[in-house]
Amino acid sequence: MTKGYIEFFSSNPRYRRLWAATVISLLGEWFNTIALFFLILEYSGSEFLLGVLFSVRMLLFGLSQPINGLLADRLNRKGLMFWSNIAQIGLALSFILVDGPEDMWWLITVSGIMMLLHGVYVTAERAAVPNIVAEEDLITANAIGSASWSTALCTGAMLGGVVVSEYGTDAAFIIDSMTFLLSSIILIPLVIEQKIDESMKGP
């Protein structure tokens, strides 16, 4: 019998930990969006580059999903989530080095790499949910996950905009990197009982 949202959440400590790590990572992923837009407009004034940035981020996220699915089947899912977060700490901080129009394509490239890593995290997280949640609770868990994704997207972008307007882009990127660090720390104690798909391995 499917549990209600509150009962499910209160009775699944491992899911709560995974959910918290994921929401914080999602907030970080979208927190820097406004800061990146601001840098592009400040240094280039190009609406075209804004479109390129958004397109690159979305295309790389979408096109990488089949490969990410294979990785989630063949590799440790907790490890994929942890290390994708760790890698994004340095990448987020690297945006602080942007200081002119000549850095715009580098900015777009780094942002695209972050979305690739975000895709790795999201796919591994979704694949990990059945490892820590009873089958009858998967619908509830997936509903919470979908709602959290949409909420984190909007909230992360909004908070990023507030920080940029009050404290500047450097502060936004520092806070952004801290969200990935915090998400990684939350993941450390999490135990995910995963059976590696041996059929996916090569000879």
Indicate where each model-derived feature is located.
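Alpha-helical transmembrane-bundle signature of multi-pass membrane transport and export proteins
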Residues: 1-203
